Amino acid sequence: MAAGRRVGPGPPSRPTMAPWKKKRLRKRRTGASQGRDSDSDDGEFEIQAEDDARARKLGPGRALPSFPTSECVSDVEPDTREMVRAQNKKKKKSGGFQSMGLSYPVFKGIMKKGYKVPTPIQRKTIPVILDGKDVVAMARTGSGKTACFLLPMFERLKARSAQTGARALILSPTRELALQTMKFTKELGKFTGLKTALILGGDKMEDQFAALHENPDIIIATPGRLVHVAVEMNLKLQSVEYVVFDEADRLFEMGFAEQLQEIIGRLPGGHQTVLFSATLPKLLVEFARAGLTEPVLIRLDVDSKLNEQLKTSFLLVREDTKAAVLLYLLQNVVRPQDQTVVFVATKHHAEYLTELLMGQGVSCAHIYSALDQTARKINLAKFTHNKCSTLIVTDLAARGLDIPLLDNVINYSFPAKGKLFLHRVGRVARAGRSGTAYSLVAPDEVPYLLDLHLFLGRSVTLARPCEEPSVADAVGRDGVLGRVPQSVVDDEDSSLQTAMGASLDLQGLHRVANNAQQQYVRSRPAPSPESIKRAKELDLAELGLHPLFSSCFEEGELQRLRLVDSIKNYRTRTTIFEINASSKDPSSQMMRAKRQRDRKAVASFQQRRQERQEGPADPAPQRELPQEEEEEMVETVEGVFTEVVGQKRPRPGPSQGAKRRRMETRQRDQEFYVPYRPKDFDSERGLSVSGAGGAFEQQVAGAVLDLMGDEAQNMSRGQQQLKWDRKKKRFVGQSGQEDKKKIKTESGRFISSSYKRDLYQKWKQKQKIDDRDSEEEGPSNQRGPGPRRGGKRGRSQGTSQPRASSVPAGRMRSELKTKEQILKQRRQAQKQRFLQRGGLKQLSARNRRRAQELRQGAFGRGAPSRKGKMRKRM
């Protein structure tokens, strides 16, 4: 019976299972393992199952909340971009980039760059720009302003577009800043697929024509070359949606008004405008020409303009000994491994100092605006790759240039404007690092130093004449104005004079640099009259050694220096009338009587001078404004901007009782008193572009009323005024440029005829590019067959242009993609998504598990090796 018993239909045992059943079981196991390791895309079925369970619990009468579907009855389509941004935002409170609702490619570029937490200016500006508002933003140097306008630009453009024309435009004042912006654009937008074109002066225009023919999404340019290319190509910027003015105040003040007007005239009406700089005035009437529409003002770090990690030192030296002091600083004060940037006034100073320092063994390079573009790139690359330790530049590199691992800045020529000082010293102490700024101040530059401290709201600290090194270190070296020991100047100057006597080239460069210094002194803006008056009151002859040098000398050397200073400052108490005169001499008696009469006046004068020397040289006292005046200032700012972010909050004083007593003792009626200048007058005057409130001539020029004549002769009379030229010894035109030819652009403005030289037409003929392929010829229905340019031609003449003659007029390159191109593009996009979410790792892990299961199963035979078809499947 046992032998004849039939087996039931239950599951067979493992050794006797058929191969086709094993294959089905393996598929089920593989599907289960994939379900465990799948990402969020494969979890839709689990979510649907949970929703079904919740629906069964709620009952048939209640519906679950869900996103609006495409079958909605509303006439307005749902804004999917806002929904995606809301979905991307973190539900919990977070201060990182996750809470801004950025798309995945943009967020991945941020993480790849290494940014974790946004800076204060990024946290304030990025959400406002994402809302589509015009923004005017100001924050101190090194605070991450470049990412503030790049990240919203990537989020707005999303991905590569098939439409013709650029959609974003970034304008920079200098080529180096544009190159740096291009570098950050490539790094942050690595995963967006956006194409960028760089339009810079000094590069070949043919390469820029080719770059614009590739239909870029973003154009990064300097204004002069962009206008040149736009006029040559008859370029239309009607598709631009997003415009950035980087270092906006520098763009509007360095003579780009004509170019900027032409660029703004080519832009469409509904574009978004963003202005960024480290120094921006509060009332941006000067930037009205940028086309701002209900802008939002964001000003951070208005009070603390300098970084806390930045240390400043001011050295009082003569103009002819600055080179010697610079050499001493580079060889003895600055560490050998540190990198230093030296700012000079003109390109002649840069060439002279480069040759001089190279002869003394200091490795250096120089950059100025007139230098060839290739040489500028080479010298900057040498400095950034630590091939040389010193870079001598003009104010070209003061704006926005981010040089990594920069430790020191030396102002060889002291800046004439406070905001220029901010941009210069802002090259160091960036992104949390520390740095030092040394400034060489000549006696005629002391008023500019006082103007700078008025602008910063700080006090000038003078070095004490006879101060011990321990006391000087305790007081601190930050912001101290002091002398340089004469022994240091003599030692370094002797070596420089020896080197100059042995080189005729150095002598010629030195002579040219001196002439350039005289031209610079005549052309630089004048300081304020208050600072000139206060500079005359300072007793610079009694100025002590700077703590930077007093700590480097021994006590014996310091005593010798003090003795030399006391001999130099010695003044006898007797006059010429009392020398070799007896007590009964009339001249001696007269001087004694005069000294007795003026004794009190002399004593009071000496006492006031002693008090001035003991106390710090404070800037002009900041007057406390009443509450009504502060409210009036806030209303003035809010009248210009729709929203103001980062206003200065009222901080309570240290002693409210003392302030109340001072208010009671004032002899002015606060209800009717109107101040003649606002509280932040000095700060805003330093930030101003046109220098309003500065020189008297500028104020007078603004108050002049120009009346137009009522006849053609009277209208042109003002343009024909002559002016005497001292060099030419004759009368010349007021501007001296009347003989230059002008051309009229599409926007109606007249620009120089040098912008139109038919370079683009020559390039198209050289590259064999047909005019009908370009976007300027009109829509596609006008590109049909028709007569060619030039009339009838023979067959032999047509062979000189092979492309134009070989392509028939009716067969043009179609912009519609074929089925194969669409499938190929979809496969590439699917492959990119597969790789971005880690599909390659999942696939390799799945293959390893499959191979392991096959080795364990082995079809019940236990053989370790596989042959034939099974081996191919593995």
Swiss-Prot record:
Segments carrying motif Q motif: 95-123
Residue stretches of biased makeup (Basic and acidic residues): 664-685, 737-747, 755-771, 812-823
UniProt keyword Transcription, yes or no: yes
Domain of life: Eukaryota
Annotated InterPro entries: DBP10_C, DDX54/DBP10_DEAD-box_helicase, DEAD/DEAH_box_helicase_dom, DEAD_box_RNA_helicase, Helicase_ATP-bd, Helicase_C-like, P-loop_NTPase, RNA-helicase_DEAD-box_CS
Basic residues bias: start-end ranges: 20-30, 864-874
One matching Pfam family: DBP10CT
Residues bearing PTM Phosphothreonine: 30
Function per UniProt: Has RNA-dependent ATPase activity. Represses the transcriptional activity of nuclear receptors.
Protein name: ATP-dependent RNA helicase DDX54
Taxonomic source organism: Mus musculus (Mouse)
Classification lineage: Eukaryota, Metazoa, Chordata, Craniata, Vertebrata
This protein's encoding gene: Ddx54
